């Protein structure tokens, strides 16, 4: 967590992830034996945090921790591009015209990725890992640099979901493509955690992993879970909007944390798979609110790739709750989709 702020008799935890701050009242308990519990720890190169209201008959924090960390370990084992023994990295190491048996979770995300790729006309794609490495952002990246046209053309031959095929329980490829689940894996993990908490009888919680989150129910005092959406800037923390969240996942994607500058141009880690280059437009960040944390995760990346105009049209067409922060000469311009206003509850500026 980034720090603790005191306001009157409330203690507010502020956790800074990518573009969101969680405002959570910390209370020791009520006379009925209920209490607010909090667990967290490292995961997938980052952290996770779970806050939930524990009623007297519900699972203790140690049991919740075991369940949550079991899910996170499974997702990491199947989908991490930063460990050579993960299922997806073993697949990535295979040559063209190979197949590998995969767990159902991996095949599910491949199908979701194909859907998002088709809906974005190929701009979003799960097979961008070779591009990430070429530009210096990926797990195999050696140096942040602008590649030559020849090097880019060679790598683009190994990019595109059309090179993937699901055959029963196997994932196959007809080119030496490499899959990167970083735009969907954490959201998937959060959905799995939320489902497990529900199954354990926990219905008031906020679950977060590597910045993707989902909230349901109320806090201990009956107030809603509140999320602050920050301006995409590094010099200070400014909340653009505060939203109430109940039953939705929230994800923010931006170009302001992982980038490099060359000749006055900003090159971020978000790629348009069609060109093979980082996006170059004025859309600084996108926050998506969606019933599925997985879809919020993937859609926030998709919309960031599309840019301010295409992303707006896409969000309106598909009824997506999206909060856009666009760079302008005088600072930032905010634009929200109709669905965002409908989904996000009471808000304050």
Give each language-model segment a name.
Residues 15-22:
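Sec-dependent signal peptide recognition
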Residues 2-8, 13-15, 27-349:
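Mature catalytic core of soluble alpha/beta enzymes
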């Amino acid at each position: 967590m980034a720090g603790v702020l005191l306001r009157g008799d409330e203690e507010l935890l502020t956790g800074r992830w990518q573009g969101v701050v969680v405002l959570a009242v910390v209370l020791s308990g009520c006379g009925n034996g209920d209490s607010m519990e909090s667990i967290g720890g490292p995961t997938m190169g980052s952290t996770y945090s779970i806050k939930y209201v524990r009623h007297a008959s519900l699972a203790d924090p140690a049991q919740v921790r075991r369940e949550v960390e079991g899910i996170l370990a499974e997702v990491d084992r199947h989908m991490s591009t930063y460990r050579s023994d993960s299922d997806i990295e073993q697949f990535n190491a295979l040559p063209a015209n190979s197949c590998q048996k995969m767990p159902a979770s991996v095949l599910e995300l491949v199908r979701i990725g194909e859907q998002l790729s088709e809906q974005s006309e190929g701009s979003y794609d799960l097979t961008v890992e070779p591009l990430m490495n070429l530009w210096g952002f990926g797990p195999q990246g050696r140096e942040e640099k602008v590649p030559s046209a020849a090097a880019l053309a060679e790598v683009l031959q190994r990019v595109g979901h059309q090179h993937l095929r699901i055959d029963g329980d196997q994932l196959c490829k007809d080119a030496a493509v490499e899959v990167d689940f970083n735009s969907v894996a954490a959201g998937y993990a959060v959905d799995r955690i939320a489902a497990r908490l529900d199954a354990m009888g926990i219905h008031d919680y906020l679950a977060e992993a590597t910045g993707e989150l989902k909230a349901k129910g109320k806090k201990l005092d009956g107030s809603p879970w509140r999320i602050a959406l920050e301006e995409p800037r590094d010099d200070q923390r400014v909340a653009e909007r505060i939203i109430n969240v109940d039953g939705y996942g929230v994800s923010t994607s931006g170009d302001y944390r992982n980038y490099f500058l060359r000749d006055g141009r900003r090159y971020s880690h978000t790629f348009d798979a069609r060109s093979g280059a980082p996006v170059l437009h004025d859309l600084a960040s996108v926050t998506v609110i969606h019933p599925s944390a997985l879809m919020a995760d993937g859609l926030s990346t998709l919309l960031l790739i599309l840019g301010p105009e295409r992303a707006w049209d896409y969000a309106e067409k598909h009824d997506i709750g999206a909060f856009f922060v666009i760079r302008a000469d005088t600072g930032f311009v905010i634009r929200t989709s109709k669905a965002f206003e409908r989904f996000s509850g009471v808000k304050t500026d």
